[in-house]
């Protein structure tokens, strides 16, 4: 079995062969597509001979148990592309790439850096009255098209409720990999949610209360996005995000002049260091990146995986979920897990990073999964595994699949799903899961502040692990940050002034927050507290 998360599709038991069930991709008739087993065998044999014995063993297990179930790429979505004439705006990346200006030194240079000629951006002005989502607030939806690779990323933009001419712009990314950011929109921090009767309910604590927010379905084939190809690693996805922002701000220069922040949760702990580094690598850009925020992220597996046992066994501030025997078993498995992750860090090759993910997720994550407790909140049982332990997702999915909704948004796929297991599988089997993307954070910290926040009831990307990797990160401010003490985080902006909502430590450009009483999705469990620290962060506090 494997458990799906709104932020992390933890393939928790891929290596536990006897008890596993792998979610199979189906063709249009409900049958698993045929695989070319001979090619699969030859590929594994070619590389197995050069691997260490332990790693080779895991590839042998995968070859035996999973070759008939795992496609090498996720299947494309059925879609119908709308003609450009049906869109309110179409921005051509080639037009942007062709603009040259003269610098102060007299030399000619491109106005905006980056490979953009293959990208277009299609924009639809959404009529809020048709959907009932934040009536009166300006909204846009559409697609970023990579015409060379046949990739089409869906986005939905909400202007700030407060002062859109001056408020910052924020990009929100859910994780997975393979989960739609519309989950974040309707379940967590967006302007509305959907009740069990499919009625739109306003969210007074939406993050667009004082900021304009872009919700992006990425990588391709997630949510309303689609493609004839696939993206199976974080670095490739970063190029698409840079193009989206560049073309969006070119179409809407009124937002380009404002501060921009990139935010997300869970597997976005992989995405955001890469995406921020990609943006910052361009000297001439129209993206005014000011900070990055990661909530309950997976960023440094080598440092975070040792904290799963303490969190599950009563050392994270909540009662133990696992018995002492299971806790000892996790301890006994940890050394081998960390050895595999270290090898992955050294090589960054899929042929060693995949076995690390398979073994560690089976030995370290699966014991918790088998209890039936919610992996995103140690306080509760998992109500419905099919809906990722949150039945509210069923109503959100049903609402988004209505023809009237898809028509209003300009959607080009036939259906919406909150998470795509095929994308998760692609990233896993390309070795992305265990790669050391935290190594990019120091270079990001040189230029912008970074906030790592964590709901303290989450298991899957728990606060202990996030505190551990931020304390361990090697950067010029490492010593001062590691020595800084956690201090009370209190509400300062409303009637609950003085109420403790968590703990915070900060030094230089780096800040860590523990949010009390929140699981994996902080804005869902603590909406008031999340908007409090979000607004204060955007306002410049702690940096």
Curated annotation (Swiss-Prot):
GO terms for cellular component: fungal-type vacuole. It catalyses: Release of a C-terminal amino acid with broad specificity. Gene3D superfamilies: 1.10.287.410, alpha/beta hydrolase. GO terms for molecular function: serine-type carboxypeptidase activity. InterPro entries: AB_hydrolase_fold, Peptidase_S10, Ser_caboxypep_ser_AS. Vacuolar carboxypeptidase involved in degradation of small peptides. Digests preferentially peptides containing an aliphatic or hydrophobic residue in P1' position, as well as methionine, leucine or phenylalanine in P1 position of ester substrate. This is Carboxypeptidase Y homolog A. The lineage of its organism: Eukaryota, Fungi, Dikarya, Ascomycota, Pezizomycotina.
């Amino acid at each position: 079995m494997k458990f799906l998360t709104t932020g992390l599709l933890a393939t928790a038991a891929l290596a536990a062969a006897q008890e596993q069930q792998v979610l199979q991709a189906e063709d249009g008739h409900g049958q698993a597509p045929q695989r070319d087993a001979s090619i699969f065998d030859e590929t594994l044999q070619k590389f197995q001979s050069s691997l260490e014995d332990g790693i080779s063993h895991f590839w042998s297990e995968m070859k035996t148990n999973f070759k008939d179930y795992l496609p090498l790429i996720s299947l494309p979505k059925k879609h119908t592309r709308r003609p450009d004439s049906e869109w309110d705006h179409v921005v051509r990346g080639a037009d942007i790439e062709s603009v040259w200006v003269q610098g102060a030194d007299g030399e000619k240079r491109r106005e905006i850096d980056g490979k953009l000629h293959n990208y277009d951006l299609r924009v639809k002005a959404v009529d809020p009255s048709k959907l009932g989502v934040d009536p009166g607030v300006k909204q846009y939806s559409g697609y970023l098209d990579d015409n060379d690779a046949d990739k089409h990323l869906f986005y939905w933009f909400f202007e700030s409720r407060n002062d859109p001419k001056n408020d910052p712009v924020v990009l929100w990314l859910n994780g997975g990999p393979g989960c739609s950011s519309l989950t974040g929109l309707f379940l967590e921090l967006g302007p509305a949610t959907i009740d069990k009767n499919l009625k739109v309910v306003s969210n007074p604590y939406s993050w667009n209360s004082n900021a304009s927010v872009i919700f992006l379905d990425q990588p391709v084939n997630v949510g309303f996005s689609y493609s004839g190809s696939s993206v199976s690693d974080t670095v490739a996805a970063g190029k698409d995000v840079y193009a989206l922002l560049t073309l969006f701000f070119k179409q809407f220069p009124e937002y380009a002049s404002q501060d921009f922040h990139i935010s997300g949760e869970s597997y976005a702990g992989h995405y955001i260091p890469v995406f921020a580094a990609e943006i910052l690598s361009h000297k001439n850009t129209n993206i005014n990146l000011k900070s990055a925020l990661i909530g309950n992220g997976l960023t440094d597996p080598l440092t975070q995986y040792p904290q799963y046992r303490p969190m599950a066994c009563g050392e994270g501030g909540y009662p133990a979920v696992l018995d002492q025997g299971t806790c000892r078993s996790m301890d006994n498995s940890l050394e081998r897990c960390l050895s595999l992750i270290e090898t992955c860090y050294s090589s960054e090759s899929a042929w060693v990073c995949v076995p690390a993910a398979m073994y560690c997720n089976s030995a370290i994550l699966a014991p918790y999964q088998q209890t039936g407790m919610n992996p995103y909140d140690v306080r509760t049982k998992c109500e419905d595994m099919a809906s990722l332990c949150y039945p509210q997702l069923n109503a959100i999915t049903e609402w988004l699949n209505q023809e009237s909704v898809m028509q209003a948004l300009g959607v080009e796929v036939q259906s919406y799903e909150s998470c795509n297991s095929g994308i998760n599988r692609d990233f896993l089997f390309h070795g992305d899961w265990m790669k050391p993307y935290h190594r990019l954070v120091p270079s990001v910290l040189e230029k912008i502040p970074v906030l790592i926040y964590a709901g303290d009831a989450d298991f899957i990307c728990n606060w202990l692990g996030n505190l551990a990797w931020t304390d361990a990160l090697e950067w010029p401010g490492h010593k001062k940050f590691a020595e800084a003490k956690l201090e009370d985080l209190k509400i300062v902006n409303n009637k609950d002034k003085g109420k403790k909502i968590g703990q915070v430590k900060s030094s230089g450009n780096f800040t860590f927050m523990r949010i009390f009483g929140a699981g994996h999705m902080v804005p869902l469990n603590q909406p008031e507290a999340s908007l409090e620290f979000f607004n204060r962060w955007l306002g410049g506090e702690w940096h």
